[in-house]
Amino acid sequence: MVLPTVAIVGRPNVGKSTLFNRIAGERISIVEDVEGVTRDRIYATGEWLNRQFSLIDTGGIDDVDAPFMEQIKHQAQIAMEEADVIVFVVSGKEGVTDADEYVSKILYRTNTPVILAVNKVDNPEMRNDIYDFYSLGLGDPYPVSSVHGIGTGDVLDAIVENLPVEEAEENDDIIRFSLIGRPNVGKSSLINAILGEDRVIASPVAGTTRDAIDTHFTDADGQEFTMIDTAGMRKSGKIYENTEKYSVMRAMRAIDRSDVVLMVINAEEGIREYDKRIAGFAHEAGKGMIIVVNKWDAIDKDNHTVAKWEADIRDQFQFLTYAPIIFVSALTKQRLNKLPDLIKRISESQNKRIPSAVLNDVIMDAIAINPTPTDKGKRLKIFYATQVSVKPPTFVVFVNEEELMHFSYLRFLENQIRAAFTFEGTPIHLIARKRK
């Protein structure tokens, strides 16, 4: 399901990040907070009144070297392109400023709903001062103290009220995948080469994101695919399009919509920090993964080159031991014909269900190989396990005490399940739960 997007904009020092953190921590529950994947907390997924939405702090995308007005102009432009709802944050302590008026004139031209949040209204006496903000022409101002959590519920109510109608569930028989990677790794060439394969019938269809065009195609076996286009990564003429943080945000949105993510690496440049950050987000989101090394035709090779690359990738992406690696060339089409079948296999792994009886046989065999650990004389007891969901496959292991299930033993059980049932290209989640 594609989540609607809420963007927070405003000049520096009005409390955008504080409001972001207040909303994100207010349960509104954080469903997937990607702090640690991006250096700045610019993106989270939350819920209010049973509606989920993606939350973006556009302040985290600023180019600090750009002129002040250019920075806030870029914020507003990003918000208008990306968001279904915009939260425009101003400061009740400082009143209406020239910068506020500048942003309001930009936002006034958009058809996107704008919610005016007057922050730093930290005591009741200040509420009378918010009426000055009617002059911005953006409707009723909402008094907020993000530091104290006052008024955030009203802002959230307004956000939910203005979110678009929920879309129908997408066809689960269609496999959705995206190609993610830094600029110049050859994503566009790969897309064109994949769609140029003789066994692929392609047609562009309107995407569900604001400006993306997804491509729907069917392979020779009749399997339908949707290739999710990270359009913003390739658009030209926009200064902020080239910033890494903006690219990260675009990649995150594509990952959210994907069943399988193809992490594209440039063989000429090797692995960069950006690659690991984006791959980490896809892993945490439970997506199927393929590591695609492109431009394989462009480097010198010997009998050891593949082995060296595989060893380096496994070392750099230690959390992606399950992800297959494929070396391709968009230029010569080397191994591109293998990608659709590989994507299909990983999608099957994502949707695989294991009968409880068979699963518990594997668990019991694992315990026989490596007995459960003890802590302070008390031994972990595993009663039974069951699979509770797919995409990714998720298992609950019922135990006597959750605290006795050490991370290393949970990882051991995961490895035993993988050895028994393969699960190619997909993370699997194991959760220890006390039996009631």
UniProtKB/Swiss-Prot annotation:
Query: The KH-like domain covers which part of the protein?
Result: 352-436
Q: What's a single GO BP term from this record?
A: ribosome biogenesis
The residues listed in the UniProt record as binding GTP 2, with positions renumbered to this chain, are: 181-188, 229-233, 294-297
Q: Which UniProt keywords apply?
A: GTP-binding, Nucleotide-binding, Repeat, Ribosome biogenesis
The function of this protein is: GTPase that plays an essential role in the late steps of ribosome biogenesis.
PANTHER family tied to this protein: GTPASE DER
Q: How does it assemble?
A: Associates with the 50S ribosomal subunit.
Protein family according to the UniProt entry: Belongs to the TRAFAC class TrmE-Era-EngA-EngB-Septin-like GTPase superfamily. EngA (Der) GTPase family.
* Name under which the protein is recorded: GTPase Der
Organism, as annotated: Streptococcus pyogenes serotype M3 (strain ATCC BAA-595 / MGAS315)
